[in-house]
């Protein structure tokens, strides 16, 4: 079925700390699909049990964070027999758990920053990154370079509801590679005007400079694209993802995480990478629908 003949439910909002960003992603996707002639309905998800409108052919998932991105929603939709965009329940759950994802990617030979589960007794000397095991949009992330910063981070982590992890700090360029279908999009470099690429810098206009394609040798760009595809496949991801990297001054890159429902706002990285590859936002959304529908019908990516 062509996207123009589908009835699409754009699911956004959700119950996580990323609700506002999810709403912005959903609104942007809905606007883009509408401009391409797709029949759609926007669904503001407000609980951990979604109600899909009658007659829906496929759900376009824009739910970032817990419930929408951790495999729970995907499992519910599988039970309903409802088609949806992106990775399945198992891959979504795996990618959302950063420690489990590290284990799998490490076993696949993918370069990673060293990381372990964090407790107050299981601590390192600075520098390091302290962050939630399962969260997105850099919520709850602390960069620790001094003992004073470490104490502040420990206090904040003690108030966080979920498990935390500690990771070696890699100083260098912040990079990302989007995957759509089987294609790795051009590398994007993000350069925040202050600090690192945290929640404020991600979603505040003018706070970050985006370089796409990133200024690097062609061979290095191809290397990162191949690493991104390898990470995507190692976790069993399908249709789309965004793989985040850090690269030091010597050109050594490590994978930080794989995002199975990347942001789709006007400031988001996947749409920017699509533009650099000659894919405008409307056609990017259509591709995601087409690939997801084919997967649902055939069990494979067409």
Residue positions per predicted region:
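ATP-binding N-terminal substructure of ATP-dependent carboxylate-amine bond-forming enzymes
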Residues: 1-103, 107, 119, 290-300
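Active-site nucleotide/adenylate-binding loops and adjacent lid/helix of ATP-dependent enzymes
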Residues: 1-12, 40, 48-54, 94-173
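Phosphate-binding site of ATP-dependent enzymes
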Residues: 145-226, 247-254
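Conserved metal-phosphate-binding beta-hairpin within the catalytic cores
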Residues: 168, 232-264, 274
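Glycine-rich phosphate/pyrophosphate-binding beta-alpha loops
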Residues: 65, 138, 193, 259-273
């Amino acid at each position: 079925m062509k996207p123009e003949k589908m009835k699409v439910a754009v699911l956004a909002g959700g119950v996580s700390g990323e609700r506002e960003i999810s709403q912005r992603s959903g609104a942007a996707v809905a606007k883009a699909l509408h401009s391409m002639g797709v029949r759609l309905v926007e669904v503001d998800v407000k609980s951990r049990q979604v109600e899909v409108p009658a007659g829906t052919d496929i759900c376009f998932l824009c739910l970032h964070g817990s419930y929408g991105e951790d495999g729970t929603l995907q499992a519910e939709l599988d039970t309903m027999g409802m088609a949806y965009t992106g990775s399945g329940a198992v891959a979504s759950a795996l990618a959302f758990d950063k420690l489990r994802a590290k284990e799998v990617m490490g076993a696949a030979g993918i370069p990673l920053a060293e990381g372990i589960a964090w407790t107050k007794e299981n601590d390192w000397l600075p520098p390091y990154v302290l962050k939630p095991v399962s969260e997105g949009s850099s919520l709850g992330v602390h960069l620790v370079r001094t003992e004073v910063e470490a104490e502040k981070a420990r206090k904040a982590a003690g108030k966080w509801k979920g498990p935390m992890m500690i990771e070696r700090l890699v100083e260098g360029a912040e990079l990302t590679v989007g995957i759509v279908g089987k294609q790795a999009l051009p590398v994007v470099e993000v350069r925040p005007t202050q600090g690192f690429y945290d929640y404020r810098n991600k979603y505040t206009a003018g706070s970050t400079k985006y370089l796409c394609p990133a200024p690097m040798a062609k061979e290095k760009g191809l290397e990162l694209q191949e690493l991104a595809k390898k990470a995507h496949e190692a976790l069993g991801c399908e249709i789309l993802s965004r793989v985040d990297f850090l690269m030091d001054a010597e050109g050594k890159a490590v994978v930080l995480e794989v995002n199975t429902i990347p942001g789709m706002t006007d400031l988001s990285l996947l749409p920017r990478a699509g533009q650099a590859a000659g894919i405008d936002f409307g056609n990017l959304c259509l591709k995601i629908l087409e690939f997801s529908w084919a997967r649902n019908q055939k069990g494979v990516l067409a």
